[in-house]
A protein has these predicted regions:
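Alpha-helical transmembrane segments and their immediate juxtamembrane cytosolic regions
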Residues: 1-238
């Protein structure tokens, strides 16, 4: 990763186009996935807490092992925070109450997490993704993406404004905060834009590109670590 005081243009490009932009999306999707696990258990008459524990425990162990070769990786934190904020919701039988808790908890924790950045955005975004699925929004927006399209009228200028603020504050004490919130707004814009594009002739193209990536996301994430380590050894990079 280019240093802040060297490769300046590359550093700025990565900060504006990649860093903090997609991690929130992945976290949000994990939240949706955990809601699907609970929903599947509920439909089959199985214990939702048990279903969550069976998924989260292996993820926690895998994340802990992955930390040994990739310090700072996300899986351990996904599992730990999911145990902390999502697992208790499996015991909330009133689904209206469950959705409400996840929604407001997600909003508050994401706002707070944006202030601290890094792994601290995980709890709120897991809850927001969970609430998103519990409200049935993935199916609703797939049928009619109009709300997502309309939200772009707010999200696009917001993302641009916060990105501009991020660039203006680069090198100052405020940069960390503007960069975090710019990343969150950018991620929200990408989600809304994707839903909009999925109702266009690009749907088949996007589906062909993203569906395999979604199915292999965990495999690719783990494999990338070993590819990077192998490449570094081959090139003699410490």
């Amino acid at each position: 990763y280019p240093g802040q005081h060297g490769d300046t243009e590359v550093y700025r490009a990565l900060e504006v186009l990649a860093h903090r932009r997609f991690f929130p999306v992945f976290t949000f999707l994990f939240g949706i996935g955990f809601a699907m696990i609970m929903g599947s258990a509920r439909r089959r008459g199985l214990s939702e807490p048990s279903a969550m524990a069976r998924r989260l425990t292996p993820l926690l162990i895998l994340g802990a092992l992955h930390q040994l070769v990739h310090p700072g990786e996300a899986l351990l934190f996904y599992a730990a925070f999911a145990f902390a904020v999502l697992f208790p919701l499996a015991y909330v039988k009133d689904h209206g109450r469950r959705r409400t808790i996840a929604t407001w908890g997600g909003i508050v924790l994401t706002a707070i997490g944006g202030f601290f950045g890094g792994i601290f955005v995980i709890p709120g975004l897991l809850l927001l993704g969970f609430a998103f699925a519990e409200w049935g929004l993935p199916k609703l927006l797939d049928v009619s993406p109009s709300p997502a399209t309309k939200s772009l009228l707010l999200l696009i200028p917001l993302a641009i404004a916060l990105t501009f603020a991020q660039l203006k504050t680069m090198g100052t004490q405020f940069y960390f905060f503007t960069a975090n919130y710019a990343g969150l707004s950018f991620a929200a814009m990408w989600v809304a834009l994707t839903y909009t594009l999925l109702r266009t002739p690009l749907r088949n193209v996007l589906g062909a590109a993203f569906a395999p990536l979604g199915r292999m996301a965990l495999t690719n994430y783990i494999a990338a670590t070993f590819i990077i380590h192998g490449t570094r050894m081959a090139l003699g990079i410490p």
